[in-house]
């Protein structure tokens, strides 16, 4: 999908959000139009469900947002008294569309002072696991990632099977091109041969700003655009540098 197509999809999601939640905004003491304003509507929703505004950022980070959306659906339902296991199941199983049913058919009462702490040990454990997965995925995808050397191409300095951590900040982390993927899994689901991602939709090639350029003798990790296997190499030259070949 091109950036234009993603923009159109973003506007479509805003329409879906508005139609399914505007009565919830009104019940929480907000204006109905606030549910229709892109980005601003999410900030207001965070206030309605009693969560920090910086959660809004997580909803726009690829891979991380796949974890955050179900959390937001459940938190929204609970903010209006829908706390049962069935409500939680329906909210997730219908990809949030259960909120439409609540929005248009139920008597809406906003619980502004609800407790944000889990009432059971299981609930507390799930919350802790979700938080750990989000942090680990954020670090794994955009900050640093562990790799195992797959080939003997650098055998004079690194051996096959060597384990190392690779910084993604130095040369600029690449935004994941697969919008739907399992967190912290590279290519296939463990113990299976199934792909851990969907080939469509795809995000156009984007890369975050680099902290520094590539220098000679740096160990660099890369993969071909059409390949999922990562390779390691040690650059011996830079663009514009003339090197004699014996």
Q: Residue locations for each model-derived region?
A:
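Phosphate-binding glycine-rich loops and adjacent basic patches that engage nucleotide phosphates
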Residues: 2-3, 32-39, 119-126, 212
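Membrane-cytosol interface at the C-terminal ends of transmembrane alpha helices
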Residues: 11-111, 143
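Feature marks short, highly hydrophobic, charge-poor N-terminal signal-anchor/signal peptide-like helices
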Residues: 1-9
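Extended hydrophobic leader/signal-anchor segments used for secretion and membrane insertion
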Residues: 115-246
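A broad, low-specificity signal for short, low-complexity segments enriched in glycine/proline
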Residues: 5-6, 17-20, 123-129
